[in-house]
C-alpha cells in the first residue's frame, strides 16, 4: 500500500481450514485459510485471513483436509520468518521470486516470471470450473527494523542515494507465506479443485522506483491475467490496527485512487532587498497550496466520495537573501470515484494556471496516476458473504467497513476482471 502500516512483532501461528456451504443463490464457494498470529509483546491473537475462492467446491470437505492444512503450519511459519529476515525492495525482489518460483515448481505447479520479479503459478484442478486468481504482494520497504526478534531484518541497501535498512513493515512477508501455504494445500487436493487457480505473487506494490515500470500494471500488461483468462481475482491485506478475529469488507469503491503530482512555478529571480524587480515563485506557491484546499472544501461534492489533496514536498532557493527563479512542489491526490478523480485533475490544472498568471508567473502541472480506485464487485461480494461469515465465526465478526483513503495497485486487476479485496 502507498502508506506504511507498522505491524506488531509476530511469532508463531496456527492454520485452520473452514468448510463452506453452498449459498442458496450462488455456486460460489470459498476455501478459507485462517492464520492465527500471536503477538509477542501483547500476547494477543491477530486473526489474518487469506481467501482462496473456488467455484462449486464440494459442500463437505473430508476431515483429512483439515489435517492437511494444519500440517502445513510449521512450513508457513518458516517461510514467513525467512522472508521477514530477507526483505527486498520494489523491483529488486530477485531472491524472493526465485524461492517462490522454485517452490511452486516443486509442487508441480506451472510457474513463470512476470514483471521482472513477479511470479505467476497455475494450478489446473481435476474438475471443470472457472479461473480464479489469488494475489499476494512481495516487496518490502526502506525502513530500519529495531527489535530483538531472532528473525529481524538486518538488510541494508542504497535507496535514493542513501544507505537505508530494508524491512517487511507492511506485512507482505505474511502475504507471501500465506499464499505459498495455500498453493501447497491446493496442490495436494488438486483432484478436488473445480477449475483453475492462478497464484499472483506481485512485486513492487509499494511503487516501482523512479521511472521504472512495475507492480500490478506491469503484471497486467505482461499477461498475468490472460493465459489462462482469469474470471475473478481475490486479494487481501493484514491490518494490525483493526479488531482481532474480524473480517472487514465493503462492496463497491473500497480504497482510494492515488495520483502523484508535480507543480513547477517559474518566476523571476531578484535580490531579497528588491522584490519588486522579480516575481517570487515562493509567494505564488503558497497561494497555490492554499487554494488547492478550496478545491476539496468548496468545489467537490463530498457527499459523493472523499477527496484529499496533499502537498508533501516543496523546494525553492539556495540563499536566504535571493528570491529564486523557480519553486517545485510535489503531492498526492486521493479520490474514491473515477469521475471525481478526473474532475480534480482538471481543477488543479486550472487553479495553478490562473493563480500563476495573476502574479505574472507561469506554472506547469504533471499528474501521474499510480493506482485506480479499488472497486469490490458488489455481486461477487454478495456471493461470498456466507462463506466469509462462516470463516469469521459468526455474523458479528463479519464487519461492513468504510472507505479507505489508502491506495492499492490491486485496483488494476479489478479493471480487468471482477475482484474483491478484503
Functional labels for PLM-detected ranges:
Residues 1-4, 8-63:
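Bacterial Sec-dependent N-terminal signal peptides
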Residues 156-167, 173-174, 185-186, 191-304, ...:
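Histidine/acidic-residue-rich, glycine-tolerant segments that coordinate divalent metal ions
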Amino acid at each position: 500500500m502507498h502508506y506504511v502500516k507498522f505491524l506488531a512483532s509476530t511469532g508463531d501461528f496456527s492454520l485452520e481450514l473452514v468448510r463452506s456451504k453452498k449459498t442458496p443463490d450462488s455456486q460460489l464457494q470459498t476455501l478459507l485459510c485462517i492464520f492465527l498470529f500471536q503477538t509477542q509483546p501483547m500476547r494477543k491473537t491477530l486473526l489474518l485471513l487469506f481467501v482462496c475462492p473456488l467455484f462449486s467446491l464440494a459442500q463437505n470437505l473430508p476431515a483429512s483436509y483439515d489435517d492437511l492444512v494444519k500440517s502445513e503450519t510449521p512450513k508457513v511459519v518458516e517461510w514467513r520468518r525467512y522472508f521477514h529476515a530477507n526483505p527486498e525492495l520494489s523491483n529488486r525482489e530477485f531472491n524472493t521470486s526465485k524461492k517462490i518460483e522454485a517452490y511452486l515448481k516443486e509442487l508441480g505447479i506451472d510457474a513463470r516470471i512476470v514483471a521482472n520479479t513477479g511470479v505467476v503459478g497455475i494450478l489446473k484442478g481435476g474438475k471443470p470450473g472457472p479461473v480464479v486468481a489469488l494475489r499476494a504482494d512481495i516487496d518490502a520497504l526502506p525502513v530500519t527494523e529495531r527489535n530483538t526478534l531472532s528473525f529481524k531484518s538486518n538488510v541494508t541497501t542504497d535507496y535514493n542515494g542513501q544507505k537505508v535498512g530494508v524491512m517487511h513493515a507492511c506485512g507482505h512477508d505474511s502475504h507471501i507465506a500465506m499464499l505459498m501455504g495455500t498453493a501447497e494445500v491446493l496442490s495436494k487436493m488438486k483432484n478436488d479443485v473445480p477449475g483453475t487457480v492462478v497464484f499472483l505473487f506481485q512485486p513492487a506494490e509499494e511503487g516501482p522506483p523512479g521511472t521504472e515500470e512495475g507492480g500490478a500494471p506491469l503484471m497486467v500488461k505482461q499477461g498475468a491475467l490472460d493465459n489462462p483468462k482469469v474470471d475473478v481475482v481475490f486479494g487481501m491485506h493484514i491490518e494490525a490496527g483493526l479488531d482481532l478475529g474480524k473480517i472487514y469488507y465493503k462492496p463497491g469503491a473500497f480504497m482510494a485512487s492515488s495520483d502523484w503530482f508535480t507543480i513547477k512555478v517559474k518566476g523571476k529571480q531578484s535580490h531579497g532587498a528588491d522584490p519588486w524587480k522579480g516575481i517570487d515563485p515562493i509567494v505564488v506557491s503558497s497561494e497555490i497550496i492554499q487554494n488547492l484546499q478550496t478545491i476539496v472544501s468548496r468545489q467537490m461534492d463530498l457527499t459523493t466520495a472523499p477527496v484529499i489533496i496533499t502537498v508533501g514536498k516543496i523546494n525553492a532557493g539556495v540563499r536566504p537573501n535571493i528570491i529564486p527563479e523557480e519553486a517545485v512542489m510535489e503531492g498526492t491526490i486521493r479520490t474514491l470515484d473515477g469521475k471525481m478523480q478526473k474532475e480534480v485533475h482538471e481543477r488543479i490544472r486550472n487553479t495553478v494556471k490562473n493563480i500563476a498568471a495573476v502574479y505574472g508567473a507561469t506554472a506547469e502541472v504533471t499528474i501521474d496516476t499510480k493506482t485506480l480506485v479499488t472497486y469490490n464487485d458488489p455481486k461477487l461480494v454478495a456471493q461470498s458473504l456466507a462463506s466469509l461469515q462462516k470463516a469469521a465465526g459468526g455474523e458479528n465478526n463479519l464487519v461492513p467497513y468504510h472507505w479507505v483513503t489508502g491506495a492499492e495497485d490491486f485496483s488494476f486487476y479489478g479493471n480487468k476482471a471482477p475482484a474483491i479485496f478484503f
